[in-house]
Amino acid sequence: MSQSCMFCPKDELPMEPKLPKGYEPHDVEAKWYEFWTENGLFHADENSPKNPFSIVIPPPNVTGVLHMGHALNNTLQDILARWKRMDGHEVLWQPGTDHAGIATQNVVEKQLAAEGSSRHDLGREGFVDRVWQWRTESGGQIINQLKRLGASCDWERERFTMDEGLSRAVREVFVTLYEEGLIYRDNRLINWCPRCHTALSDLEVEHQDQKGNLWHLRYPVVGTDRHLVVATTRPETMLGDTAVAVHPEDERYADLIGKFIMLPLMDRQIPIIADEYVDKEFGSGAVKITPAHDFNDFEIGKRHDLEFINIFDESGVVNGNGGRYQGLERFEARTRVLADLDAAGLLEQTEEHLNAVGECYRCKTVIEPYMSLQWYVNVQPLAEKAIEAVQTGQTRIIPQQWEKTYFEWMFNIRDWCISRQIWWGHRIPAWFCAACNEVTVSREDPTACSHCGATELRQETDVLDTWFSSALWPFSTMGWPDKTVALEKFYPTSCLVTGFDILFFWVARMMMMGLKFMGQVPFKDVYIHALVRDAQGQKMSKSKGNVIDPLTVIDEYGTDAFRFTLAAFAAQGRDVKLSVDRIAGYRNFVNKLWNASRFALMNLEDFDPSGIDLDDCQLTLAERWILTRLIDVAAETGKALEEYKFNEAASVLYAFTWHEFCDWYIELSKDDLYGEDAARKATSQAVLYTVLEQLLRLLHPLMPFVTEEIWQALPGERPAVSIMSAAFSTVSELPEDRQGASHMERIMDVIKGVRNIRGEMNVPPGKRIAAVLDCKTSKAAEVMAAGEGYIKSLARIDDLAFGVAVERPAQAATQVAGDIEILLPLAGLIDLDEEQKRLNKEIAKVEKDVLMFSKKLSNESFLAKAPAAVLEKDRQKLADAEEKLSILKQGLEKLAALQ
């Protein structure tokens, strides 16, 4: 082995003894993921005495391919899982996939169509076998992609919603709810997809605003020369009209209530009824009523005992109830009906109208309200407890703003249509008796009718809504309905990380089912993350061409850079605006850490970290500062993760790593590391080792691969087989010096001030200069005395004078750093006249840029035609040029003051 190690992994540690010059993510990621899995580091021990932390993955569809939503969701979950594992918890991250009924059936049906076949050719059993075959061959793609993301799920426990154990749980829940009268069968209006030939819940219907028409139709009143005008966006449904409604207080139609309309094209009389649903101020104040094809009309139809006439078949084709329009597809029927009404002089007006059209969430076919016999869950009693659980804090929803959305839906919840007319899914465990027509619902397949004892039974052909089995996910995956050790240890789960788009589909239903069947909430926290959009805040879509593929990004920039980017932009309640440039920026961060680690390792070759006790060391001011800052960063990172503020954790770690550790401490340590004082060098090595080793632990949940690679390359024995098994932080054992840290930061402010002046005045960076520090207090002078060596070294100063009321040099550029004024004598350093000429020349150039971009961005034609990305880039260029111009002018003013 390249390292000695206190633990004995199954294989040699898969790494070189030293870090190569460049970081190659692909090779590093593959070897460490294999190492973690082969050594069982993701596995949750249900018999462990450690406190549990459990989280269930929102199971991706078995048809799925990793997209940005998956990437964000699973990165955040993995950060939590790795952090809690390192923080001493027994972590179960439960993985699995969803059978995705309609989606998977569509995929396999397309395959069959390409082969010139169909599911009907195979028959139900043959088709289901074919889907299982597809799942075996292709269904694991999304899981392999999650592994590339670094997901530390317990893959030994991977579940599938059609697994035998989960299927048993589904049947138990269905039968129990049926026995309690909460599941029932009813003939009512549902959302119907004419393409998928199945019912859809309200949540499975996506509404899109579409430009269409509002047609005003004339309906003759029987026995008079009057007519009523009704407006509709779906004129074909008039074939099923069974009434015209007016408001009971509408005086215009008071004398017509109770009379009849002669329904055009159908020669059928329908009544004029009064109902308060009608808005008498909208349109003519008269509304056509089609109870079998409109949800509002359905309720009116029930109130007035109207006839329900279904005019379509399951494919959206007009049936025998449509008279002469029988056999026409619904939109063909619309065209024909409008033409015939127009010919009869009954089409009064056509106006443009923006309409919210409901579409199937899977195939995007326009849905049809359709009368059908379906299975339902009465969710009202279940919802009451789920509402109470959030109200009383048993479950927290984070950010809290989503609680309002949750309550609004739950307080207005409607019964859940759970039956689907497809073949792939959990078949409803109900059997119909040929003898008595009664239904038998059973945990086991029955051999006889539970009502009359007859043996000729036919099982329900419908399957359950995919979300029915998903609603049981937190406890069915742990072995329910059996009382398992896993359930005892890990239920209720600690948190759920999910997108807001499935708050109702999934989260609310898990709440209801968990409380019903486990007597406890399924999770203590629900963290709802935002959407990943493009750099301009636009939703990613193939049609816009702005989709960023996670796997392409991982291949190009590495998983760690990608993960850190997602975390850095995952602010609560704010969508992630993602661009490839930002990911490239965080790749630079990974490289910065890599290069700093290479520097450290080169200076730790002769160092043995065993027995480090920094309390016994004579620490410099810089060392006390970096250790104190490390203690604070560890606390801030842990607090941010505890509060699901992933962006704050990333920000704290980024700033400390890049600026404080790499830019400052490494530079501050070089004199000691390169010096002749052996004791001083040993202490400097001990601090460098400690800070880097602890920093890698803090970074690991966000950047698991590069941190493992570097951590394993550190000298000495490792305290664990992997960094992911090490403690998240042991900084509580480190010495801290608050006053010393404060003094060091004042010294650093002075160094930054000197550097700023050098930059503004164009003093060559390598040129050693003189400086004067006018201290306003004796305490400030004491601090400067303590930091004299640092200031001279890092600010490249040969002659440094400081004190209270110190003599001020002539022709000096100045800057204030707190209670210290920095003065840099410029005489002999630069030619003031030449510098003034240079600045004027640069100002003229930048002013041209500002003028050019200003004109461009005030051009209405350009603004109207240019893509959003181009506009954004030009606006940024203008802002950068204006900022540069301001800095140059300030520099010129300072020069003028010196002359």
From Swiss-Prot:
Position of sequence motif 'KMSKS' region: 539-543
Placement of sequence motif 'HIGH' region: 60-70
Main location, first listed in the record: cytoplasm
One cellular component (GO) term of this entry: cytosol
Gene Ontology biological process terms, A to Z: valyl-tRNA aminoacylation
Coiled coil, from the record: 827-898
Subcellular location: Cytoplasm
Gene3D superfamilies found in the cross-reference section: HUPs (3.40.50.620), Isoleucyl-tRNA Synthetase, Domain 1 (1.10.730.10), Valyl-tRNA synthetase, C-terminal domain (1.10.287.380), Valyl/Leucyl/Isoleucyl-tRNA synthetase, editing domain (3.90.740.10)
UniProt keyword annotations, A-Z: Aminoacyl-tRNA synthetase, ATP-binding, Coiled coil, Cytoplasm, Ligase, Nucleotide-binding, Protein biosynthesis
Subunit architecture: Monomer.
Free-text function comment from the UniProt entry: Catalyzes the attachment of valine to tRNA(Val). As ValRS can inadvertently accommodate and process structurally similar amino acids such as threonine, to avoid such errors, it has a 'posttransfer' editing activity that hydrolyzes mischarged Thr-tRNA(Val) in a tRNA-dependent manner.
Family: Belongs to the class-I aminoacyl-tRNA synthetase family. ValS type 1 subfamily.
Name of the protein described by the UniProt record: Valine--tRNA ligase
Species annotation: Syntrophotalea carbinolica (strain DSM 2380 / NBRC 103641 / GraBd1) (Pelobacter carbinolicus)
